[in-house]
């Protein structure tokens, strides 16, 4: 029997249409503001019991999504050309219909799939997102590695008398895994987790730094130099080369070599990119490419505590010429009111690698303490992703 539509249902539908229309007329920053407003409004309506249940649910959502990945729910529904019956999904993944039905009903209740009829389901936009290899890699990485680390963090902070974590071998990760190695050393001995990490890192951010950073205006006389060996761009620790590919696409007319650097095992699996050279390079060792115009480090510094960041900077400095620029692509936090996505990442980096997301003052202290100077900062996303333009301090004297 159909449920009769109430006046409240009609008003909520109109409100939903208004919100969707408002979101369609704004940019990503405005969209995030709308989402934050709706979340805050929802939380303001909660009873104490509903607040408790929300926190219970937050933890279990992650568990259920991981189960959905294991059961191939998201890829199965995404590739289907029509809604699927429970039995048909079970035929794909071999799950018992009773268990599968319980999982699917929960996934539908948290809007990761659509329940369109009795024991009938189809994909929505979140389903399609979760079916992407990089997104699934991030889910699996978080489930396999970050969740145990997060669980160990409260007890570790109690043991430390609530002092900041500053050693990469004394983190919540080390406590959870009973390891004395830094995370990025340990993870290379864990093939599955390392593959999840590689997939997650390959996910392109929604915003493109090249739209905000005026690269051509920072070239100086580089474009007019006739040297065929001159190097335009070195992507240090660049994983599979997404940024090199983006640079080539946006500035096909620029001359100069483009070089992708990472550890040998990453370079070995990177697909060949036309016009992009590859080079095995550990960013903690002296930079092999000398005199490039741009040395680009994306999310490298936020992976490392300050002492290791100083080693990274020291390894680069001998390669810099007077016209060279270091581009640090990382977050520059607000002193007040930073978004929860970024403050979450800050705690996650502390728990995993004893690092942190940095404010402008913290970036300045780190760089000036290592003999460098910030020339400019270009923010390119509403989550404070920024290009920090840096030169050795001696070049600014």
Swiss-Prot record:
Give the positions the UniProt entry annotates as the active site: 302 (proton acceptor)
| EC number of the protein | 2.1.1.-
Q: Which residues form the signal peptide?
A: none
Q: Which residues cross the membrane?
A: none
Statement: the UniProt record of this protein carries the keyword Zinc: no
Q: Which UniProt keywords apply?
A: Methyltransferase, S-adenosyl-L-methionine, Transferase
Pathway listed: Mycotoxin biosynthesis
Q: Name the enzyme group at the top EC level.
A: transferase
Q: Which Pfam families match?
A: Dimerisation (PF08100), Methyltransf_2 (PF00891)
Q: Name one GO biological process term.
A: methylation
Name the InterPro entries for this protein: COMT-like (IPR016461), O_MeTrfase_dom (IPR001077), Plant_O-MeTrfase_dimerisation (IPR012967), SAM-dependent_MTases_sf (IPR029063), WH-like_DNA-bd_sf (IPR036388), WH_DNA-bd_sf (IPR036390)
Q: What does this protein do?
A: 16-O-methyltransferase; part of the gene cluster that mediates the biosynthesis of the diterpene glucoside brassicicene C. In the first step of the brassicicene C biosynthesis, the bifunctional diterpene synthase bsc8 that possesses both prenyl transferase and terpene cyclase activity, converts isopentenyl diphosphate and dimethylallyl diphosphate into geranylgeranyl diphosphate (GGDP) that is further converted into fusicocca-2,10(14)-diene, the first precursor for brassicicene C.
The similarity annotation says:
Belongs to the class I-like SAM-binding methyltransferase superfamily. Cation-independent O-methyltransferase family.
Q: What is this protein called?
A: 16-O-methyltransferase bsc6
């Amino acid at each position: 029997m159909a449920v009769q539509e109430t006046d409240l249902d009609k008003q909520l539908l109109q409100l939903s249409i208004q919100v969707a229309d408002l979101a369609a007329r704004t940019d990503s920053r405005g969209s995030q503001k709308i989402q934050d407003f709706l979340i805050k409004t929802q939380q303001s309506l909660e009873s104490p019991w509903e607040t408790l249940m929300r926190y219970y649910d937050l933890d279990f959502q992650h568990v259920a999504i991981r189960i959905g990945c294991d059961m191939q729910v998201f890829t199965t529904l995404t590739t289907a050309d029509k809604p699927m019956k429970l039995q048909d999904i079970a035929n794909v993944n071999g799950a018992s219909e009773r268990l599968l039905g319980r999982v699917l009903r929960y996934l539908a209740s948290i809007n990761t799939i659509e329940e369109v009829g009795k024991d009938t389901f189809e994909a929505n936009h979140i389903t399609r997102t979760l079916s992407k290899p990089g997104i699934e890699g991030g889910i699996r990485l978080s489930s396999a590695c970050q969740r145990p680390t997060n669980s160990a963090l409260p007890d570790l902070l109690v043991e430390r008398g609530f002092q900041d974590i500053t050693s990469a071998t004394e983190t919540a990760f080390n406590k959870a895994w009973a390891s004395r190695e830094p995370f990025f050393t340990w993870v290379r001995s864990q093939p599955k987790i390392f593959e999840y990490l590689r997939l997650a890192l390959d996910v392109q951010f929604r915003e493109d730094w090249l739209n905000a950073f005026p690269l051509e205006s920072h070239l100086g006389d580089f474009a007019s130099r006739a040297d065929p060996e001159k190097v335009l761009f070195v992507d240090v620790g660049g994983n599979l080369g997404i940024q090199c590919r983006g640079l080539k696409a946006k500035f096909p007319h620029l001359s100069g070599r483009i070089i992708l650097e990472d550890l040998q095992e990453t370079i070995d699996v990177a697909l060949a990119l036309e016009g992009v050279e590859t080079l095995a390079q550990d960013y903690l060792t002296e930079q092999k490419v000398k005199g490039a115009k741009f040395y680009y480090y994306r999310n490298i510094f936020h992976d490392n505590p300050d002492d290791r960041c100083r080693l990274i900077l020291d390894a680069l400095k001998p390669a810099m010429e007077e016209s060279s620029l270091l581009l640090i692509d990382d977050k520059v936090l607000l002193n007040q009111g930073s978004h929860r996505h970024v403050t979450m990442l800050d705690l996650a980096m502390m728990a995993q690698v004893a690092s942190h997301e940095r404010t402008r003052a913290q970036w300045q202290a780190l760089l000036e303490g290592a003999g460098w100077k910030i020339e400019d900062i270009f923010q390119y996303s509403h989550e404070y992703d920024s290009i920090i333009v840096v030169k050795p301090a001696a070049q600014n004297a």
